[in-house]
Design a protein with these regions (language model features):
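Short, hinge-like loop/turn segments at secondary-structure boundaries
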Residues: 31-35, 113, 149-150
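Short helix-loop capping/hinge segments that flank enzyme active sites or metal/cofactor-binding pockets
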Residues: 32-85, 134-143
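Structural helix-boundary/capping segments
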Residues: 1-10, 71-72, 82, 125-191
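An anion/phosphate-binding loop that grips the pyrophosphate of nucleotide cofactors and donors
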Residues: 91
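Short, surface-exposed loop/helix-turn segments at secondary-structure junctions
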Residues: 27, 72, 101-120
Length: 191
């Protein structure tokens, strides 16, 4: 991984390890996020009809979550947080993927009802500072990124590490990426 090698070249000690309970955070997120979306859309005059299909899918999934399941997820989140906090007493940062695959083409079918696991869920659920950074493109020109995660209240460290990697990899060429992505859409025109 280029990001890990960059930190290693700068003198950081880099070693593979996984924070405890990350897989459980996705399960907790699969309860808490839909329940939250459901609460938000119930307060909207149109019930969230104008929202992005993926948010509507989360809201629909939230309708079947019981108060008991919600409370159980909140309790488990607290327990997992204690384990992850102990992990960050041994490590300053985690470098990990943002998503389990590279970016999807705009022409790939989007399923509004498929709830994808995200490598960001554990950060969201445990209140950890994280930053997603551009690190290059695939051979097809699709953007690739990584995520830097710090322990609770380590926001400044995450921002500093992000700055270091941005200096090493450069900023994302947004105009060029937008043209590439636009031209990948059937019938799309590059501008």
């Amino acid at each position: 991984m280029r990001a890990a090698n960059t930190f290693r070249q700068l003198g950081a000690r880099v070693q593979p390890d996984d924070p405890p309970g990350i897989d459980r955070c996705n399960a907790i997120h699969a309860t808490l996020w839909p329940a939250c979306c459901r609460q938000l859309t119930e307060g909207m005059a149109d019930g969230g009809a104008a929202l992005d299909p993926s948010l509507r899918a989360y809201s629909d999934a939230g309708a079947g979550i019981s108060r008991q399941a919600l409370l159980g997820a909140l309790i488990e989140r607290g327990e997992l947080g204690a384990g992850v906090n102990a992990f960050f007493e041994r490590y300053d940062l985690v470098i990990c993927p943002v998503y389990p695959r590279v970016a999807m083409r705009l022409t790939e079918p989007q399923s509004g009802d498929k709830l994808f696991p995200h490598f960001t869920a554990w950060c969201n659920q445990l209140g950890l500072p994280a930053a997603s950074l551009y690190t290059g493109t695939t051979s097809e020109g699709l953007p690739v990124g990584i995520q830097i995660v710090g322990g609770r209240h380590a926001d400044a460290l995450v921002l500093w590490a992000s700055h270091i990697l941005e200096l090493a990899f450069g900023r994302a060429p947004f105009a060029e990426l937008a043209r590439t992505l636009s031209s990948s859409v059937a019938g799309g025109k590059a501008h």
